[in-house]
Design a protein with these regions (language model features):
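Interaction/scaffold regions that mediate signaling and macromolecular assembly across diverse proteins
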Residues: 1-180
Length: 180
């Protein structure tokens, strides 16, 4: 939590602050060990934090999601030790986090791109997870860089996230429009 507070400002990550930080190295190493959860929010917070830490670690290792091949290496090929197994960021998102049935995760996990959700300057915590995810969702939906409404044509221009994960938003609210 202190590391995020010191190195994340308004969603902008100070990657050098993580590079040689012993606390960050210890946290990433700890992620490799099997995990136990006291409930759904504990599990969600753990996996969101793990995803974001591994996404940062990928950038620090020189992986870059800025090209098609770079995205494939970053999300689908690089395996990370997590909770007693090796897993890609893609599989962590699609096979572990998404099946937990919480669409707000799409506003919490980062993809190291300016078009993706901001990284919070605090860790996700089980006891405050709902409030944190609500805040992330509000910020993302109301961010004019990611979403905007043209009053003249009465047209909403939404982030691609709403298209990519439409089934998650529909499952939660019946439609993406109702979700928003």
């Amino acid at each position: 939590d202190a590391l995020l507070r010191a190195n994340v400002r308004t969603g902008v990550v100070n990657y050098p602050g993580f590079q040689d930080n012993a606390s960050f190295r210890a946290y990433v190493a700890e992620l490799a060990k099997p995990a136990r959860f006291s409930g759904r929010n504990d599990e969600l917070a753990y996996y969101i934090n793990a995803y974001n830490a591994l996404a940062i670690e990928g950038i620090l290792e020189g992986l870059s999601p800025s090209t098609l091949l770079g995205r494939a290496r970053y999300f689908k090929f690089k395996e990370w030790p997590l909770a007693g197994r090796d897993i890609t960021l893609y599989d962590l998102e699609h096979k572990v986090i998404r099946p937990l049935g919480e669409p707000r995760i799409h506003f919490a996990i980062i993809c190291a791109s300016k078009s993706c959700p901001f990284l919070r300057s605090e860790a996700y915590m089980a006891e405050s997870l709902d409030a944190q995810l609500d805040e992330q969702a509000r910020q993302f939906v109301n961010d004019p860089f990611r979403n905007r409404f043209d009053k003249a044509t009465r047209t909403a221009y939404l982030s691609e996230i709403f298209k990519w994960f439409d089934e998650d938003f529909r499952a939660s609210a019946g439609s993406t429009q109702k979700y928003i």
